[in-house]
Curated annotation (Swiss-Prot):
This is Small ribosomal subunit protein uS12. The modification 3-methylthioaspartic acid is found at residue 89. The lineage of its organism: Bacteria, Pseudomonadati, Pseudomonadota, Gammaproteobacteria, Vibrionales. NCBIfam families: rpsL_bact (TIGR00981). Belongs to the universal ribosomal protein uS12 family. Gene3D superfamilies: Nucleic acid-binding proteins. PANTHER family: 30S RIBOSOMAL PROTEIN S12 FAMILY MEMBER (PTHR11652). SUPFAM superfamilies: Nucleic acid-binding proteins.
Amino acid sequence: MATINQLVRTPRVKQVVKSNVPALEACPQKRGVCTRVYTTTPKKPNSALRKVCRVRLTNGFEVTSYIGGEGHNLQEHSVVLIRGGRVKDLPGVRYHTVRGALDCAGVNDRKKGRSKYGVKRPKS
């Protein structure tokens, strides 16, 4: 425990919190342009072809973003909205594309969890 004199001389140092999503710059989402759309494989023990895209953001950052849901319509030069949120089995992927916003269409025939995949309520 520090004495009051010691604290007067040098105050306590605040711990600096490092952001998990630095490219968003404290914004909820950011817009960007796809520079490359491709598939990649997850790390062990999982096996799949995960759909990801490389995105150049409006603030100049270039990040890798995961495309969730079954099927997508993205290609090079598509304008997308990205949000934070990493993919645990893809190293270096710290962002998600927002489905149903800008050029990224929602998931077809999605019935459950629709809000996460940009799907409107079906006509009963």
